[in-house]
Amino acid sequence: QLVVVTSSGTDTLAAEADVYTDRSTFQGYGDAGTLRIDDDAVTLVRFGLDAYAGQAITSATLRLYKLEDYGGATRDIGVYRANQGLDRPLTPPVQGLAAAYPSDDGIAAHPSVLLFADFEDPAFGDAWSVVDHAEHLELVDATEGNGFHELDGQALRVEVGAGDNYGGSLRFRYGDETGSEPDEAWFRYHLLLGDDWLPTDGGKLPGFAGTYGVAGWGGRAVDGTDGWSARGTYKVPVAEGDNPLAGHTSIGSYVYHADMQTSYGDIDLWVDGCAGVLEKGRWYTIETHIRLNTPGVNDGLLEGWVDGRLAYQRTDWRWRDVSTLAVEEVWMNVYHGGTATPPSDLHLYIDNVVIATERIGPMGR
């Protein structure tokens, strides 16, 4: 209950909706008869306050009634205003080297750029060290449909077919293309989710890796000496309904690292400012920056940027205990699952990829 006091009197309101969430699952427990409060649960409660528009509220008191007490421990309960982020004013984007190149024209000539891919050439695969599952990759233009519209000419369509896990995979291997492997790297791509983007499981998106064909993907846990990876990830879209985030897809990082506790990577979502929550049919500028840790020290840096705004930053990663592990490749990987496969075809679109040795940022306008 919420007890609201105004100059007109006192009202006791019942909740319009409530749910608690547990970190162990993306599911919400909105259909439960009670709410739970503990260290791993967040409770959300909504009260209808439209009737008080224009009135001065003297006080508002939240009343919670305890039904059960497990373990006898006391809890400090914090009460906050929930803000999903979509209504926050956007901060100005942070620019990088791309700001000097409207529509990325001429950016390939910049001395810090190692690769620029705009997918205008049917032989686009020649610029990459490895192309896997090429049958899932196709160049498309404005006639595509499916919510697609051109960013800057043609784009690369990636398909995950019904009953399949694989999208496509492009690999830029630093050793093959530049002669050495760095400890720090940047890459940026543009991403649009098609209207048919309805995955039934989370999966993988482009990122960095140093698996060396040994460990760091597919349940091959790492130990600090044999490999690592920091690919992107996506989660199942928010269910349709009375929710401003309905249909949106959260993205983040999927990381195999030396402190991992299971055989599979850990997920960190890019949720700062709600920047890593994507809607279908819109182009986003996605940039990742990695600086590998000092061997044996938890000081590795991983950053994610969306449309030039910092969406994620973590500074305590430990990927390696030996200096022989470096940034082996940019892995433009799209994969559904896990092991679950979608019941229908899914499509996303990629354009204007830049791999560089410094911050790239959004394309110039």
Predicted segments, located by residue:
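Flexible, small-residue-rich N-terminal segments that precede or flank a structured functional core
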Residues: 1-52, 65-69, 75-87
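Extracellular/lumenal ectodomain signal focusing on beta-strand-rich modules
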Residues: 46, 51, 59, 118-121, ...
